[in-house]
Amino acid sequence: MILTYYCIITMIIIAYLLGSIPSAVWIGKKYYGIDIREHGSKNAGTTNMLRVLGRRAALPVFLLDFLKGFVAVTLTEILKYDAYITDMWLINIKIIAVFAAVLGHIFPIFAGFRGGKGVATLVGAITGIYPPVVLLC
C-alpha cells in the first residue's frame, strides 16, 4: 500500500514536470531568436506565438502543449494494474494529474515560473481522460 502512495506521488510530480516544459519559450529562442514572454501578451503559450510569430510557429507549440497534458494523464493508466487502485481512485488521480500538468504549464519550473495560460495543455489532458468531450468544444 505504501508503494502505491509513492507511485501516485511520482505520477503527480511527473505530470507537473511534463507541464513545466516551456515549449513556446524553447521554440521561440531556438528557431526565432526571441523570448516570447517579452512580446505580445507576454505569455509563453500558443496564442501569443500565433499573434507574434504566426501559424508556422504556433502549430508545434500547440502540439507540444497538447501532448504535455495528454501524456501526463495517460501515464496514470499504469496505476490501474496496482491491486489497491480502484476505478474511483484512478479517476481522482487523473484529475490531480490534469491539475499538476496545467499548473506546471502556468508556473513552469524550467522557465522561472512564468508560463502560459494552460489552455492547450488542458485540452490535451481532457482528451486523455475522455476524448468525445473535446469534440463538443
PLM features: residue spans?
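Interfacial loop-to-helix junctions that mark the boundaries of transmembrane helices
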Residues: 3, 84-92
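Hydrophobic alpha-helical transmembrane segments
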Residues: 5, 9-13, 59, 94-99, ...
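N-terminal signal-anchor transmembrane alpha helix
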Residues: 6-31
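Transmembrane alpha-helix interface/packing and boundary motifs in multi-pass membrane proteins
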Residues: 14-20, 102-112
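Transmembrane helix boundary and interhelical junction motifs in multipass membrane proteins
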Residues: 20-26, 114-120, 136
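Cytosolic, membrane-interface loops and tails of multi-pass inner-membrane proteins
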Residues: 25-58, 115
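Interfacial segments of multi-pass membrane proteins
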Residues: 50-54, 76-80, 100, 119-137
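Multi-pass membrane catalytic core of lipid/isoprenoid biosynthesis enzymes
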Residues: 51-78
